[in-house]
Amino acid sequence: MIEDKRWKGVYSFEDSPFIMEILTQLRDKNTDSIEFRKGLVKLGRYMGYELTKTMEVEKVKVETPLEETEGIIVKDRRNVVIITVLRAAIPLMEGLIKVFEHARVGIVSAVRGKAPEFKIEMDYVKIPQIKPEDTVIVADPMIATGSTLTRVLGEVKKYGEPKRTIVLGVLAAPEGISKIKSEFPDVEIFVAKIDRELDHKGYILPGLGDAGDRAFGEPLKLSTLPQVHHIE
């Protein structure tokens, strides 16, 4: 885990060969949807494991079959709320749940419009109550312009003030990180890697393409369906 010196509280996992290997597979344009989804699940699980290293632990006594010894529990692991940004974050959440099995889950549907406005449409929000002892993890694979996540983070704040708020992603552009940190300076950001920049359409370069489309298939636009002529 490496803290990026350009911002406070921004970390990447570029020092993890295993996470970088999974990312390489996700970047490959020849990786099919099944393997892409599997890769996101793996990243969710292993980045979740890395997150536990930043959480509060408590020493406990435990009885083995032979004698008493000392162990620990990760206290914060039992007080987690995962916010899933549809649809690309579903596999990430699946991986995170394997680490934070007690987590409560919120769902947000947020769609980013086209350049240059990048207007955000949010039409579905289901978030549980957030308590002072909670760690909120907002999962979204791609932190591009930051417009979607700043809107989601603003919505999450309405449900309570947690102990920590974390944004967990696969890739981030510097532009998106700067936007989030300017509006929510206390939010921590953890990503597999910080990429170079955005293109004019707001896509991360070198990136991995549209994570939602690659994981679940490109959605069909109804206007492309052949017209059916009814004979009366």
From Swiss-Prot:
It comes from the Archaea. Uracil binds at I204, G209, D210, A211. One of its GO terms (molecular function) is GTP binding. Pathway: Pyrimidine metabolism; UMP biosynthesis via salvage pathway; UMP from uracil: step 1/1. Binds 1 Mg(2+) ion per subunit. The magnesium is bound as Mg-PRPP. GO terms for biological process: UMP salvage; uracil salvage. InterPro entries: PRibTrfase_dom, PRTase-like, Upp_A, UPRTase/APRTase, Ura_phspho_trans. GTP binds at K38, G39, L40, V41, K42. This is Uracil phosphoribosyltransferase. The gene is upp.
